[in-house]
Amino acid sequence: SLEADYARYCDSVGKKYNEEYAFKVLDLFPNFFRPGIIDILKNIKKKKKKNRLIKVIIYTNNMGPHYWTVFIRKYLERKVGKVFDYIISGYKPGTNINKRTTHQKTVPDILRCTGLNKETKFLFIDDQQHNRMVHEKVTYMKIHPYNYGIQFKTLVDKYMASNLINILPKKERETFKFYILNYLSAGLIGYNYKVTKQEISKKDLKEEQRLSKFIEVFIKNKNTRRKKKRKTISRKSKKRY
């Protein structure tokens, strides 16, 4: 069957496939990530060095496996260094992946999953409306959704033209291309993939600037900083004899 043949060829790739290789595959398609996200994360990292109270959380409703979110975090940190403090992945009842109690995004769940105190103030950035994140401790930034797609043939051709294909013997490459294209085109990846946008728009670039500025203002705002508790030192009067 097509699925069996596809699995066989993927297995031959998988024997030499590792995390670093997967990172290099992602490097072929930088537009899969929102424009400017790497520079934004680098800037946040600089801010964190000056203020250890700044924490960065990945809070996602993606229902893929937890390791996929971890993989994306590792990929981004490969570019910018350690920047994320917590990952809160999709709610999966009956598992111990995290301490979420609902599919909805909520402040109580963030506190439960991270252990942060209830006085913590958040900048919440999302392209969807999450009503339970409208909260006195939350500055909510709803951003324009970023969509970018590649036709399967373009995606496969770019991969085949890179040196990453060298993990397969030359005599097997065209056969691999045939099976992977047919597998993708047959809709066997588990969901309906539609390419609606294949270029970065002016709106995407403007949103990058707006996002950078919003983060900068939030971090600078004294009212959004957590204050460190000062130790009170009692001074005893010295007795002179």
Segments (PLM) and residue ranges:
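Alpha-helical substrate-recognition element adjacent to the catalytic core
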Residues: 1-95
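C-terminal cap/substrate-recognition subdomain and adjoining C-terminal extension
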Residues: 65-239
